[in-house]
Every structure is written in structure tokens, then in C-alpha cells.
Amino acid sequence: MEEPGATPQPYLGLVLEELRRVVAALPESMRPDENPYGFPSELVVCAAVIGFFVVLLFLWRSFRSVRSRLYVGREQKLGATLSGLIEEKCKLLEKFSLIQKEYEGYEVESSLEDASFEKAAAEEARSLEATCEKLNRSNSELEDEILCLEKDLKEEKSKHSQQDELMADISKSIQSLEDESKSLKSQIAEAKIICKTFKMSEERRAIAIKDALNENSQLQTSHKQLFQQEAEVWKGQVSELNKQKITFEDSKVHAEQVLNDKENHIKTLTGHLPMMKDQAAVLEEDTTDDDNLELEVNSQWENGANLDDPLKGALKKLIHAAKLNVSLKSLEGERNHIIIQLSEVDKTKEELTEHIKNLQTQQASLQSENIYFESENQKLQQKLKIMTEFYQENEMKLYRKLTVEENYRIEEEEKLSRVEEKISRATEGLETYRKLAKDLEEELERTVHFYQKQVISYEKRGHDNWLAARTAERNLSDLRKENAHNKQKLTETELKFELLEKDPNALDVSNTAFGREHSPCSPSPLGRPSSETRAFPSPQTLLEDPLRLSPVLPGGGGRGPSSPGNPLDHQITNERGEPSYDRLIDPHRAPSDTGSLSSPVEQDRRMMFPPPGQSYPDSTLPPQREDRFYSNSERLSGPAEPRSFKMTSLDKMDRSMPSEMESSRNDAKDDLGNLNVPDSSLPAENEATGPGFIPPPLAPVRGPLFPVDTRGPFMRRGPPFPPPPPGTMFGASRGYFPPRDFPGPPHAPFAMRNIYPPRGLPPYLHPRPGFYPNPTF
């Protein structure tokens, strides 16, 4: 409907351009007046063309509207006629259907009257045949039942003799079920204890992560403030340089103007010099023509007053010209000096722009690093949330399973009592009871196998969770080291800022000399900086423990230079090209990442302990997981150095705890100086144990499970993570459990339900992490 109105619009511009060309091509006499009635000619022509097209559009729209109204009237008329025809058709169809129904009813009545007689006779014959067949079947069934009853009587006589044997078997199975229920109860108590330890470790980990996040936020804010201050200083310097440049340019323009004026003056003087020479020649000719010397002298004295004035003026002009030449030379020297100064200013400006660009690139890189660290923090928080939800779900499942098992035990006890009563009352129900006993035995076997499989799977899960917790702690240590690295960068930028404030021209100093001579984190004579010279001292976290002397070195520190397990450490050099033995001798220096060339998986394999039946070999302690930052650098880690000095990671605690426990058990094992032996035996033992090897627990200790560490800033029990699960599945080796301090027979290896009340648990429960039974009923 709107196409005719839309077609002229794209062509309006072309029409107007053609009209303008036609008007421009007309001669001046034929052209219309420029301002008819006060309006320009182009506007009048455009208005006329637009009015013409508007009239056309209006006519077209009116024609379409009238036509559409005519179509509507015709459609209404045709609709009325169609509705009338449809009504007539419906009436005719109804009449036809009524007539057809009447005809069909008449035919059915006639056919029924003929067939009713035949059907009655056939039905009577069929009923008689059916009764005969039923009687024959009943006779055969009665004979079969008689035979079955005779067989049942024989079987019941034989089953009476087996009744006593079944009773004895049932009593034995009940006792085995009671033993299994006892063992399950003990395992459930152990699982509860392990869940509590996992909760404690999660809380500590959450607190450590919060501290790391706070440090990150503080570092980011301080970093932003430093960048803002440095940017403001550079802006002020650039504005001052721009002002100096403007003043130099103004002075340059003024000097050029002075030079132009003096050049013009010199040109005028050079123009006057030939005229002065001509006047001097005329005067000499006049003096030679005179004959008398007296007259000549008199004339000279008389005319002296008239001639002295032009000669003196010429001499003055010559002297002034010489002075102007000297001043011009001096001005040219000043001009060259000003040009040299301007070139130096341009060079300094270019250097400043390059330095600003470098700072901007550094700022972009630091922002990208901050974004990466924020993403890692978010990932760690998500992992923590997932772990907490997982442990909560496991706790709920355990409670539900315990209630279900108690209800199931009560129901089974009731069933067993009913079975005994029924056996005593009626001997005919022995067959049903035997079937029930068989079903119960099958179910019990299934549950036993199921629980065994679940115990295996949950122990594996516990080991995996332990490994995940250890990796999380290592990630925390890496984050702290990264924070320390950022603090070191902040201190360096602060020192640069102070030097720039003192002497802004000191930009040619190399970064190496600057970091080594002026940084407070440079190596001191004692190997570490003092706490007063640092800008950002590291706060003491919850995982920081008091200093412990390692059995490897007499001066402390977990890595000695004499350990043969790392032969490459003696050949590594730092940034200055000096050997790295100084770094190894210093016990308070942060370790570097250049020591190990093995993957983390191999390092985790080296951390494997021997099985519970064997003793620890006299080899070196498992190698530490080396740091990720400050590779090949002799410079200390700045604010993070005290943390490496104070904190003991989980790997060190894992190594130190067995040695402390063994020393508390046996006073004869005090000498630990012979532990520096190559760890070549560890890979062989790991290969012998196989891929499904689970690390054994710590050495047995009397009293509480974890010793209380009162030397740290906070009272806590033992390491932040529980010990690894035992290597055995349904009962550990004898070397693992402590000596029994209570009388009575030993417990069964795997007990089940018991109809008697529960007994007291032993005072010491061996840890079995990851045990979450999941029975199926």
C-alpha cells in the first residue's frame, strides 16, 4: 500500500541536482531573480517540486483508500452470500442423514428377525459342549493334586531330619553378623574423627587464604597510589619542560627579529660608505689646485669648521659598523647556543616520552598480572566452596546412613525373634524360614562385599583429598611468594621515586646498579636484610611456626649444600655471574627454582613412605618442592624473606613429625646427623609398591593423636592436615597400632550387626580417612 509513496523519495536528490544544473546553464537574462519576494530562487524551486510530489502522493493515497473501501463492501456482500449457501448445504445434509438412518434401521430390523432363531439353537449346543470339557479338566486336575500331595508328604518327612542342622547354621550366622556390626561401628567412629580433622584443616586453610587476599588487596592499593604519584610528578615535569620550551621559542623569535634589524642597518651603512669615499676624493682635488701653502693652510683653518663635521660623522659611522659586526658575531654565537639548548631540550623530551611509554607498558603488564592473580584467587575460593559443600554432604549422608542402619538392625532383630518363635511353635513353616535365611545370607554377603568395596574407595578418596590439601597449601605458599615479589617491586619503585625527587636528571643509572646499591633488599653482610630497612614487613600468618633446627644441617635450614641428591646446585650461577654456593650456605635465604629438573609428579612419588611393616630407610629426607620465583638470583626476596625464614611448609612438617615422634618413643635415636644419604632407594620402593600404593601412617604415639605445639603464636594440634591413611584395608599391621592398654580379647577384623547393646570403644582409634559407607537395601 505504501510503495508508490516510497518510490519518489530516493529520486528527489537527483531531481534537485538536475534542476540546479538547468538553472545554472540558463543565461543571466533567462534566470529568475535571486530573491523573489525575499526568498532565494533555489528554495522556491525546491518547494515547488516538493509540493508537486506531495500532491501526487496525496492523490495516490486517496485513490488507494477509496479502492480499499470498495473492496471491503464487495467482500461483505460475498461473505453474506457464502454464509447463506453454507446454511442451505447444512440443511440438505441433515435431511440426507435422517433419511439414511431410517433406511438402515429398517434393514437391521428385518435381518434380526431372520437370524434370532438360528442363534438360539447354536448357543444351546455350545453351552453343552463347554460343560463337558470343564468336567474332564476338573477330573485331571484332581488327579494331579493327589500326586503332588503324596510327594509333599515324602519331602516333609525328609526335612524333619534337617531341621536341627539348619538351626545350628542360623545361630552361627547370627554370631558372625554381630561381629560384623561391631566392626562397622568402630569404623563409623573413626570416620567421624577423620571428618572433624578435615574440618579443622579447612578452617585453617580458609584463614590463610583470607590473609593472602588481604595482602593482595593492600599491595594493589599501594601499587595504584605509587603509580598515581609517579604519573603526577611526570606530568608536572612535562608541563615545566613545555613552559621552558615556549620561553626558548619566544627568545629565539626575539633574537631573530634583532638580527634582521641589525642586518638591515648594516646594509644601509654599506650603502653610505661609497658616498663618503667620493666626498673625500673631491676634497683632496681641491687642496692640490692651490699654489700657496699659506693660503692652503688658511683655507684649511677657515674651512676646517665646515669640513670636520662630515669626516667625524663618517668615522663615527665606521666605528658603529665595526661595533655592529662584533655584536652580530656575538648574537650569532648566542643563537647557536640557543639552538643547541633547544636540541638538548628536544632530546630530553623524547627521552621522557620514551620513559613514559615504558612506564605505561609496565603498568599494563602489572594490570594483566593483577587480573591473573584475581582469577586464581576466585578459582581457589570456588574450590574451597566445593570442598566444604562436599564435606557437608558426606556428613549428612553419614548421619542418614547411621539412622538407616540402626533401624535396619532393629528390624532384623525383630525378624529373628519372630523366626525363633515360629520355629518353636510350628514345624511346618521350616521350609519358608530356610528360604528366608538363605535370602538373608545372600543379602549379607552382598552387603559385606559392598562395604568392603566402599571402604577401599573411600580410603582412596581420603588419600586423594590429602594430596589435594597438600597441593592447596603449596599453592598458598606460591601466592605468598608472589606477594613478596610484588612487595620487592614496590620497594624498588619507591626508591626510584625518591631518587627522581632528589635528582630528576639521574635517569641514566642502570637498573642493576640501582637495585644492588640502593635497594633495602640487597644482600647484607649477614645474608638477609634487617627488619627496620624494609618498607613492607610481612605479617605473621597462622601457618608460621617457630624456628626448628633441621637434622640435616647444624645451623638450620632444610637444604644443605652437601646433599648428594641435588648435584646441580653447586654449578648454578646467579644474575651477577657468581656461583650459587653462597645462596646455599645462607640458611635464611629463599630457595630458588633452578635446583630441580624433575616434574611435580616425580617429586610426589619421592614423598612416598615405606609400607607399615617396614622401617624408614636411612636415606635423605624426601626432597622439598622447590620455589617458583627468584630463579638464578642472589638477591634476597625482600619483604618475603622473613616468611621463608619463619614458616615451615607442609613438606617440612611431614618430614619433621616422624623424626620427632620416633625420638619421643626411643631415646637411643637422638643422633640424626647421618641422614644425608642419596634417595636412590625411594624410586625402587615406589615401583615395587605399584600404582595403587597408599602412604602409611605416622609412627605410633601414646596419648593424644596429635601433639600440642605450644611454641607457636597459636595453640593448635599437630600439623594443619591429618596424616595419610593406613596402607591396609580391614585391619592394619601390628607395627601401626599402639600397645593395648585395656584387657579383653582382640576385636574381630570385620564385624557386622549385633542384637546385643553396643560396647565401649577403645581409647585409641587408628585414623581411616575417607570412610563413608553407603548401604543399599
From Swiss-Prot:
Q: Which InterPro entries match?
A: cTAGE_MIA/OTOR
Q: Which biological process terms from the Gene Ontology are attached to this UniProt entry?
A: endoplasmic reticulum to Golgi vesicle-mediated transport; protein secretion; vesicle cargo loading
Q: Of which family is this protein a member? A: Belongs to the cTAGE family.
Q: Name one GO cellular component term.
A: endoplasmic reticulum exit site
Which gene is the coding source of this polypeptide chain? CTAGE8
Q: What is this protein called?
A: cTAGE family member 8
Answer yes or no on keyword Coiled coil: yes
Q: Which residues cross the membrane?
A: 39-59
UniProt topology in membrane = Single-pass membrane protein
Specify the species.
Answer: Homo sapiens
